[in-house]
Design a protein with these regions (language model features):
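Class I S-adenosyl-L-methionine-dependent methyltransferase catalytic core
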Residues: 1-161
Length: 161
């Protein structure tokens, strides 16, 4: 999935990662504290950041993405598809797009084994802040399998080259 989104957004920073699971060349670790670190220190502006925040407390990450969008830094954030929570209401007041991933749930990767883990009990959505002025929040969908298949085709092309 990340490869497909990277093709669309050219993601330059993984804002909540470790050396073992970073998806971008530049990343911010828990110890570096992404909520306190200026993202502009890690990418050219305008640019996009990948953010898969800890699901236990998403609100401060929504606030950080909204703040960074004022600095011409866009964010693509993967979160549970739950529209009943306060952070969702806060996100749609500042985000440019909510993209629901439909047609199945995402399997997450076990950080130790590197293998997909099924049993995700919720669907997922992407909340996107663009690095330019916001006009409204658009609600869209993307098929999970289309996203995964597109990413797999890109990976296969890279490996064949």
């Amino acid at each position: 999935m990340f490869v497909a989104l990277d093709a669309e957004f050219c993601l330059k920073l993984d804002a909540a990662a470790s050396a073992d699971n970073a998806l971008c060349n530049h990343y911010i670790t828990e110890e570096q504290n992404t909520l306190e670190t200026p993202w502009a220190d890690y990418l050219s502006i305008p640019g996009y950041v990948w953010l898969n925040p800890p699901y236990s407390d998403i609100t401060p990450f929504v606030q950080k993405a909204a703040d960074e969008s004022k600095n011409q830094i866009g964010t693509v954030m993967l979160v549970p598809a739950d529209t009943s929570v306060g952070w969702f209401r806060e996100a749609i007041e500042t985000a440019s797009e909510v993209r629901f991933i439909v047609g199945g749930r995402l399997a997450f990767i076990n950080p130790i084994s590197g293998k997909p883990v099924s049993g995700n009990n919720k669907g997922s959505m992407l909340i996107i802040w663009h690095p330019y002025p916001r006009t409204h929040c658009q609600f869209t969908t993307v098929e999970r399998d289309a996203l995964l298949n597109f990413g797999a085709r890109l990976i296969a092309k890279r490996e064949a080259a």
